[in-house]
């Protein structure tokens, strides 16, 4: 480690680099024992046991398998929340290193093992130093990968039971150099929705199409027509995506089926655009189907709202990153990300910011959701240091 880097100007943050091996052990243990969303029993217990050993008050079962640690210091009523996700993905791991997944068909392919280890490292450090005045809530969230763990925690009274004045989360970014951060004010990640369009026609023999109403033909025209939604209804300076990803109809070569189904996904950076797309999907599907004598029913299901960083908290987080690694290593205008993230549910309740941390850009830095992915252990101290310094600055008592 280059000891001239800004992060080492703070002696007590240097300890996080000295504790890198411990965080690495936690991370690799979690990686070897991945658990899917709402099944994170071992992971939750590991987190709870570690927090308890640090002297942090532990609350289990928040949003099913979520864990919250509460650490108080001083007399201030101010509070801040720090969040990490814990779940793995249904992917068969291709790696062969010793800490590879021991559960066939399940792996940590998105770095949630690293996110959890970084927050544990920060929790241990803050519990030892008490270098703040107020309350820190360490939020370990289950089920980020598409099944609503953040929403479950919020609905379970997360912020009613553990009130936070501000909230921060972090995700690793493969392809971004180690020791770098990216922070964006305003919309950062798209909201996501799924849709199904069921087209009803009238079945017939394939040799006698005139005796039926072909739902496949209608579905094909619907798939084409809905591509006009973004190009003709979304302002060119905004961004949205409508993708048909499935078309299912029939199971015989010589039979025009009775029905067809189109399915797909929508991404947008505002709820207004998302709602508009949902309305137009139904309108276009019904109109096009009617033109062929068929009918169409649309089921539009928003999954995640857009992730929107609070401008003030984004500026604050960027300042913390710049203090740690230097302003030249903090990108404040990263591109919008079309992927979705359910931390957006929490940010809809509490002002805060979601930060990206570099996972390395060298050889082997493959993307997330890849069977060859592994979190870069060298990033652990950077993430832990970000959380620590953020708490110290946000809750006063900023010893350097």
What are the residue ranges of the model-derived segments?
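Acidic/His- and Gly-rich active-site-bordering loop/insert found
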Residues: 2-108, 113, 117-132
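Active-site beta-loop-alpha junctions enriched in small/polar residues
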Residues: 35, 85-87, 143, 173, ...
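Metal-dependent amide/peptide-bond hydrolase catalytic core
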Residues: 2-5, 217-400
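Histidine/acidic-residue-rich, glycine-tolerant segments that coordinate divalent metal ions
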Residues: 67-68, 89-107, 113-114, 126-257, ...
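A structural signal for isolated positions on well-ordered beta-strands in alpha/beta enzyme cores
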Residues: 59, 137-139, 297
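Non-cysteine beta-strand/loop elements that form the S-adenosyl-L-methionine
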Residues: 81-83, 92, 195, 354-359
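Divalent metal-coordination and catalytic microenvironments
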Residues: 30, 69, 82, 112, ...
């Amino acid at each position: 480690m280059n000891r001239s880097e800004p992060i080492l100007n703070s002696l007590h943050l240097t300890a996080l680099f000295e504790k890198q091996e411990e965080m690495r052990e936690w991370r690799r243990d979690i990686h070897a024992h991945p658990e899917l969303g709402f099944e994170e029993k071992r992971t939750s217990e590991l987190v709870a046991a570690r927090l308890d050993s640090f002297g942090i008050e532990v609350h289990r079962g928040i949003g099913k398998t979520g864990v919250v640690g509460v650490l108080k210091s001083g007399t201030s009523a101010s509070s801040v929340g720090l969040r990490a996700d814990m779940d793995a993905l249904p992917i068969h791991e291709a790696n062969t290193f010793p800490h590879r997944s021991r559960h066939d068909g399940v792996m940590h392919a998105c770095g949630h093992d690293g996110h959890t280890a970084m927050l544990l490292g920060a929790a241990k450090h803050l519990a030892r130093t008490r270098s703040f005045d107020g309350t820190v809530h360490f939020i370990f969230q289950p089920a980020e990968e598409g099944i609503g763990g953040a929403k479950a925690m919020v609905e379970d009274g997360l912020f009613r039971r553990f009130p936070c004045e501000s909230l921060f989360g972090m995700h690793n970014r493969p392809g971004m150099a180690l020791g770098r951060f990216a922070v964006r004010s305003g919309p950062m990640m798209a909201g996501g929705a799924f849709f199904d369009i069921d087209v009803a026609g009238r079945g017939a023999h394939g040799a006698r199409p005139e005796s039926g109403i072909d739902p496949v033909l209608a579905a094909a025209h619907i798939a084409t027509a809905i591509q006009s939604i973004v190009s003709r209804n979304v302002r060119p300076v905004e961004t949205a995506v409508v993708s048909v990803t499935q078309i299912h109809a029939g199971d015989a070569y010589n039979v025009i089926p009775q029905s067809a189904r189109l399915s797909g996904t929508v991404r947008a950076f505002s709820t207004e655009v998302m709602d508009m797309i949902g309305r137009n999907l139904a309108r276009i599907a019904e109109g096009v189907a009617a033109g062929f004598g068929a009918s169409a029913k649309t089921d539009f299901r928003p999954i995640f709202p857009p992730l929107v960083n609070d401008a003030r908290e984004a500026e604050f987080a960027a300042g913390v990153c710049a203090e740690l690694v230097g302003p030249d290593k903090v990108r404040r205008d990263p591109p919008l990300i079309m992927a979705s993230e359910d931390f957006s549910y929490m940010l809809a309740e509490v002002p805060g910011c979601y930060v990206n941390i570099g996972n390395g850009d060298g050889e082997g830095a493959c993307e997330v959701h890849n069977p060859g992915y592994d979190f870069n252990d060298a990033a652990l101290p950077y993430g832990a240091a970000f959380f620590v310094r953020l708490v110290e600055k946000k809750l006063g008592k900023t010893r350097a």
